[in-house]
Amino acid sequence: ITGASRGIGEAIALRAARDGANIVIAAKTAEPHPKLPGTIYTAAKAIEAAGGRALPLVVDIRDEAQVAAGVASAVERFGGIDILVNNASAISLTGTAQTPLKRFDLMMGINTRGSFACTQACLPHLKSAANPHVLTIAPPPNLDPRWFKDHVAYTIAKYGMSLLVLGQAEEFRPLGIAVNALWPRTII
């Protein structure tokens, strides 16, 4: 699960842990953040307390080498990958004039490119799983202008994730790999 050190990713991990799942926490947060609770290590402790097995890994999903190393560690520790949860996301609810290009690149790099990179790296292992899935935390692609108006850069980055789901669901269907999106809008 990418971005599972806190928030929705950690909540998904804790729910899976109650079913005894093996969970890789792939996130950048190894040290406590001054404003946001949770690290990969606190999440791992909570997962194990809930009944799961955890492998906390520092992974910046924008970095192909870190993604590849994380996937290799997951396979070595747990013997394979059955499901990938693309949860990591960068958010900036700002308009065009208020969004620096560095922030735009961050959102595109994490949300869209990072999800693509993680799916690509997990694909060989998903092909050999008994019931493989890719679950991406992404909204339904609704082109109503109201969803773009106040934060076009963020919406584009999240819709990139949505389009990955649509495309990869069709691409991977013959392989028996289910690809779905979940958008918990009532939580966010």
Predicted regions and their residues:
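Short-chain dehydrogenase/reductase
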Residues: 1-78, 91-92, 102
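A short helix-coil junction within the Rossmann-fold of NAD(P)-dependent oxidoreductases
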Residues: 19, 77-78, 94-95, 121-130, ...
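Short SAM/SAH-binding signature in class I
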Residues: 82-83
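A short, exposed helix-loop element centered on a Lys and neighboring polar residues
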Residues: 119-120, 166
